[in-house]
């Protein structure tokens, strides 16, 4: 059969798919955590895909106004699940739907996770019941938002300036915005939707400042959506992405709320103005971890979508010829194209392993904390243990959140570039995907700040280890002796492909960095206070967090492969090796500097990365099919399952832009007058001198 | 009122809060500048004369109501397409009678404020017009001028190269131009949907004519891809010519103002004279004459690359200015209890995120200027060439070849660098970087196509890497090579060079360090290349095997070029008052580049592990030094608030006031109910779920 550029792609795709050497379903099950989970996932995906309100076919052409309205309709369509879904189902649904519609996911999550999460996490059980009765869980005559950030202050809770002053006479708090810089800003759901908010404000009782606490403040009258007295709200307007989310600003001018609207699970204020502080303050921040943990999973889901598009396209797109061929070469067959995409495919798999581990730890820890009463002295030991675990999870999730959200942004961007011009088309989703995604690198803790705080945590853990004290499992390796002794003769090939060696190489690199930074820290604190010393070591803290997190992803990947079925194990191992070796290649300075590897090893690693790319290349369709995404979730014609990319892409462009009139809408008003203009000559004064 | 209120800041005995402090802080920061800002601007612009000309043009743009950008970020695609057309119409008036250099300046400055208009006019003047001038004969050029191509009357051109199934690989294009000897015409045809011309800027709405790239087929023989002028629309009513189909490409990641379209040709007939015949000629009898040197036809592609390097600087400077001004007034977290929050510019890590990028933006300018000047000289030489001057021709061909590879690497790494600058500066502004009104989102979306068009950056880099290896091969054979790679001649010295206790703040040592890194990578790749050829591979196959090495070679070589050009420009042009501040930037750039790629220097043995610690300390040191002058360095870019178009980056530092005002101007707070309250929100909040009916029949 002869084919041309237009008809060749689906034929090629079928051939590529035929190269798969493993049972795709086994990898899908491995990724999802078993056949049972896969079935749950598929059920949720089809409930999304079949709902006409959730159809994303025309999404790329929506303007801001259309996107806002449509997102509200989708929130309404998804709201019944808020009541019926278990926690697990709810997470799956949000993550799966978030892959194709990040705005709806966020707009719903503002209420469901941030608002409800705060009431549940920081309110007493009675308070939680009260707000449930008002309609908070069912979302009836009620929509909540989360008023934390201020115009002049981001995630630094201590710096917030909104005040909640206790007025004992009326037994009320007075919520106030002292100046424009303290306006609540970026508040998702505020501009259009919310009736209530959880407001972060400084608790002031009898003139004393007790720090930032949470208060429920009604924003709008429920029956007509008009603003409550003293509440001013505006629309934040155009953002880089997530147009569907109605972010707004809020100012409070002496708004009075009952004392009981302060969320009192931890700090309490009595009707006589007596303030009781919790035994363990850290626990109030546990809720922030939920966001981080789910962003790690989101990084995986969004990455897998764009990698599938770029790799499918690479398998059917031809560009340039190498000598002798009549047809141009498929771009997937260029070694450099493989190097651009295949390590990222491996990275994406690694994210999933890291995400699952973090989610498991988080669920266990939260369940334990919610079962404890912070004010019961008998539970002190259990509480302290829970606090240690939370702290460790807090630090670990910081680095994972930062590097996976960055990793995902890089993947969207690199995949777009790998699709050449068609990656720039609105209809292949990369532009919107990137614009919607990247806020994840900023919100709920700016990635750089998170990394620095994690680096600080790592140095503190190292100090614990040096003092012979107990640290959590994920950091214990810092206290071990390195099993690698480089004698300058180089490392044999088998070693460079062995999981044990690669994990140990990363641990050695990470350990040396952390310990060297700890040495410097101990030197500096002789003359500086700890904060100053840590500031001096900013670059080092960042590097520690970066290498430790990479080490963590690599070791989790290998650990999880141990549980995989035999037929898929070799393929997963190739991916994991590719990820580890490529990571070394990207960071050769560290491994040379720590004398873990020799210059000769680096050359060998370069060729091993080439070899592994070639080995993985034939399996790319299988490895991406295993993500189990239908064309609905792909939402990019050049990434469609059947590979019939040009036909689908051409059809999509023409559906969205029917070619009816060769004249633009502004032909009469602008274009014609321009093309047919007669310039008036400058008059020349005719008078002779 | 409250001693713990971290919003209370005292400056010179007066109290300010988060909202009122920023302009005062900005004035303090500005006062720290130790060098004459104006002199720095002259240095960047290449002299006072250029600065004055730029200022005149900027004022003309800024004062023109048509170029008012107050609403810019809220325009939807339809609105921005129309506005862009109006702006193109206005700009075309300047193109007619101004010196070419001023036109270039105007385009470059417009490009900072509005990339869509820049491109949409560029589609005609850069691409269509450039192609007719560059590949048409003088008579042909005169003909199209007489039709209105020169001043855009009853005429608008576009450039139909890319096809749906084929990008920048000219050899793969499938549109055909078959010569019909009987009628003395070419028949232009699109053989199947994948050969549809795609991404054609100006096609969907504007263009009357196009230059189309099609395979020249005469008497059944395929002579490869040539360029033809084809009329697309009837002039009088803008309807399509017979055989032409055009559609709108619709939504793109960015550059909404450009009407990219697709074009299909169904046996469209054009006169033989519409083939642009400066190089390839077809006569009445169907005799085809091919040019002696294909390389000469590529000259016009270099123009685009050189101007993209310069655009990278222009756009980069806008965003680094915004982020650094904001960093000087934004406070976040407190390092000392009881004290106000710290300005984010004072965090060492924030300095490391932004200051090397500031240095990078400066470096881009030096290299873009240098390559631009080389390009102009070469083009002049080419124009002056006598037909029988063999030696002169060889020299020009060798210059063009070198420019081709130098500009490839420079285009790739400078457009990537600019994308990185926009992205990192956005993140450095935290949440406010994500606001539409501070410009990052739109600029990123508009910018990044530069990394793809006119040669995908990865492909360009690989081809630059190929040229580097070819130069090394030539050197080994004793053949002459161009200036840009002349350092490779010192191969043997470079192979074993070490720092040996020399100072890492000596420009000569730093340039040498990069020559060592680049030279060894190139030479090692060349060894491998020669080995593969020896094993029987052909050149293409050997180069494919060495893809990663080619990429690295081009990357390191280009960085070396940027560093060397920066130091050399300081040496030759900087006056005493600005020399040290410039050296501080150049040293920061060179040292940070080493830190980012420390593996290279350890691997070659030029540096030892302890030297890497020194490099890190020096980067910290230069960050601290440069930090004091950031307002001076960015003021020197000389951008008014119009060109900045981001309230958090405005000159006076009154960021929160301007930003709050902008948001409210664009989104007046009138109705707390959204437009869809009655249709969607209210029915949702007040819904009553219907209970499922339960069948009440009792079982018997």
Swiss-Prot record, chain A:
Enzyme class (EC, first level): oxidoreductase
Family: Belongs to the acyl-CoA oxidase family.
One GO term describing the cellular component: peroxisome
GO molecular function, one term: flavin adenine dinucleotide binding
GO biological-process terms attached to the record: fatty acid beta-oxidation using acyl-CoA oxidase
Subcellular location: Peroxisome
Superkingdom of source: Eukaryota
Cofactor: FAD
Catalytic activity of the protein: a 2,3-saturated acyl-CoA + O2 = a (2E)-enoyl-CoA + H2O2
Keywords: FAD, Fatty acid metabolism, Flavoprotein, Lipid metabolism, Oxidoreductase, Peroxisome
Cited Gene3D superfamilies: Acyl-CoA dehydrogenase/oxidase, N-terminal domain (1.10.540.10), Butyryl-CoA Dehydrogenase, subunit A, domain 2 (2.40.110.10), Butyryl-CoA Dehydrogenase, subunit A, domain 3 (1.20.140.10)
Name of the protein in its database record: Acyl-coenzyme A oxidase 1
Principal subcellular localization: other
Lineage: Eukaryota, Fungi, Dikarya, Ascomycota, Saccharomycotina
Pathway, per record: Lipid metabolism; peroxisomal fatty acid beta-oxidation
EC number(s) given by UniProt: 1.3.3.6
Active site: 444
InterPro entries tied to this protein: ACOX_C_alpha1, Acyl-CoA_ox_N, Acyl-CoA_Oxase/DH_mid-dom, Acyl-CoA_Oxase/DH_mid-dom_sf, Acyl-CoA_oxidase, Acyl-CoA_oxidase_C, AcylCo_DH-like_C, AcylCoA_DH/ox_N_sf
Keyword Flavoprotein: yes
Residue sites binding FAD per the record: 149, 188
Swiss-Prot record, chain B:
Pathway(s) per entry: Lipid metabolism; peroxisomal fatty acid beta-oxidation
EC number: 1.3.3.6
Protein family according to the UniProt entry: Belongs to the acyl-CoA oxidase family.
Catalytic reactions of this protein: a 2,3-saturated acyl-CoA + O2 = a (2E)-enoyl-CoA + H2O2
Keyword Ubl conjugation (UniProt): no
Taxonomy, superkingdom: Eukaryota
Gene Ontology MF annotations: acyl-CoA oxidase activity; FAD binding; fatty acid binding; flavin adenine dinucleotide binding
Subcellular location(s) of the protein: Peroxisome
A GO BP annotation: fatty acid beta-oxidation using acyl-CoA oxidase
The protein's required cofactors: FAD
Keywords, alphabetical: FAD, Fatty acid metabolism, Flavoprotein, Lipid metabolism, Oxidoreductase, Peroxisome
InterPro entries named in the record: ACOX_C_alpha1, Acyl-CoA_ox_N, Acyl-CoA_Oxase/DH_mid-dom, Acyl-CoA_Oxase/DH_mid-dom_sf, Acyl-CoA_oxidase, Acyl-CoA_oxidase_C, AcylCo_DH-like_C, AcylCoA_DH/ox_N_sf
GO cellular component: peroxisome
Name of the protein this chain belongs to: Acyl-coenzyme A oxidase 2
Assembly behavior: Heteropentamer composed of five different subunits.
Keyword Metal-binding on entry: no
Functional note: Oxidizes strain chain acyl-CoAs with a chain length of 10 to 14 carbons. Also active toward the 2S isomers of acyl-CoA-esters containing a 2-methyl group.
Major location category of this protein: other
